[in-house]
Structure formats: structure tokens, C-alpha cells
Amino acid sequence: MNKTYKATGINLKAQAMGESDRIVTILTQEFGLIRAIAPGSRKYNSSLGGRSGMFVVNELLIAKGRSLDKITQAQTIKTYPGLAKDLGKLAASQYLAEIVLCQALSEQPQEELYELLNEHLHRLEELPKGESFGVLAYLAHAVFHLLALAGLTPQVQICCLTQRLLTPNFVDPNWRVGFSIAAGGIVCLEAWEGLRKEAQKESREKSLPHPVTPAYQTVVHRQEIPVISARLNSVELGMLQQLSQPEIMQINTTSDASWLSVEQILRQYAQYHLGRPIRSATLIDSYFAANHDATV
């Protein structure tokens, strides 16, 4: 880079610095994540005030610094005002920003991640007002796509144990499938139960006294039994399997609780692979708990 450089980026995080400045974390197409000072941006009528806000997309001219770069010019090309007008949309967008901050690299182009985030923020903003569980569905869709871009796609079409295709059984209301975070996706519960019983049987046999110890033993490595993180019904599995599509399935408001389950599964899966909690998820929990109470 020269002493100054140009970049197009979206603001994902801002924190106060000194009396009137901000440090802004920006996802840029050209250079990935950068942290730069927005000088005087907290002053009244500062030209950088609004341009350093969350989810504002700017064309930037940035001066290189010893420890932190400095924004010298910013021209706004896109904003998402609709996100701030709806608590659910705002919480969902902050949730996505946290994931992106964990995934994005510095000093490397991140055009695909930049475009994907902006696309899903646009979809969230365009949702009709009052569709609270639509927000949850669109959030789950975005999280799945971000995980896929990072190479962390959960296995939702075939069983992690048997490698056989699993399709939802909509006829049997008691039908369930397991989801194992450690195994990386869905698990046929019949196969899982068979492994568990086999392991219990072997454990009992080992505890019995053996009169003669053979000179040699055959070591058999059994398939590890994964922990089941959640159990999904047919509707929830169907939703999960459709999240890989470019467009989200038609939202059925009668399946509100199912979207809650799908989001919870993806949240736990993302946190496991990112190695940290998603703090904005607490806002999602509070928002949907309040909306559920209001409709009961």
C-alpha cells in the first residue's frame, strides 16, 4: 500500500477514542478487515459523524498510520436505515456482523464476504414491518450462507454416521432426527441408538472376569458415538435442508417455534466453530420472548 489508499467498505464496529474520535472496524472489498480512526466523528456536525455509523457503506480514502490508519475522506454510497427502525432487524444484523468479524481476514480481498453480508442485510431491511419470525427465518438463512462461505457448512442432507440420505417424515408426528455439533450435522437416531447399545454391551462384557488372558488381542476401533445436541422434527429438518438454497423458502407463520429451533441449532454450531459466543444472540432471545408473550 501507498501512504494513502482507497477502499469500499461497510462499518461493522465502532468505539470511542479520546474526546471526539472513533475507531471504526470496516469490512472492505479490497483489503478485508481494517481498523481506522474517524477523526472528529463524535463532534456535532462532523462530516464523518453519520459516515462512521453502523452498517454504513462508504467509499474511503485512508491514510496509513504507524499503529492505526486514519480516514481522510468518506463518501456514503449505501445505508440501511430500516434496520435501526426495528429491534428484531437490528439485533439480527448485529448478530451477522459478529460472525463476519470472526470470519473476515485482514490485508486480503474479501469481496465475496462483503457482497454476501450486504445482500443479507438488504433482505432483512426489505422484510415487511411486523414479520418478527420472518426476521428469524432470514437470520437463519444468512448464518447458513456465512458458514458455507467459511467452509463450515453443517451436513443436513445425509446422516453423519451412515452417510445415507435423510428425508423428513411428515406422516409420523413422532418422527425425529438428531443433530450433533461435534459430528457436524444430522444423525439418524436409529443408527445412533444402535451404536450406543453396542457400546454398552461391550462395556458390560469387559467388566466380566476372564479366566485366561490370551497371548495377543485384536484391537477393534469402534465408531465414536457423537453427542446429540438437539432433536429435530420433520418440519425443522425440512427448513434446515432448504437453507442452502439462494432464496429462502416461503415463510409459514404457523411454524414460528420451528424457526426458533433452527436458529438455536445454527447458533450453537456457529459458536462451536468460531470458538466464542455470539453476544447479540441475547438480544434475539429477549426480542422473540417478548413477541411470543405479546401474542399469547
UniProtKB/Swiss-Prot annotation:
Pfam families attached to this UniProt entry: RecO_C, RecO_N
Domain of life: Bacteria
A Gene Ontology BP annotation from the UniProt entry: DNA recombination
GO CC annotation, single: bacterial nucleoid
Family (UniProt): Belongs to the RecO family.
HAMAP family found in the cross-reference section: RecO (MF_00201)
Purpose of the protein: Involved in DNA repair and RecF pathway recombination.
Name recorded for this polypeptide: DNA repair protein RecO
Species this chain originates from: Trichormus variabilis (strain ATCC 29413 / PCC 7937)
Recorded name of the encoding gene: recO
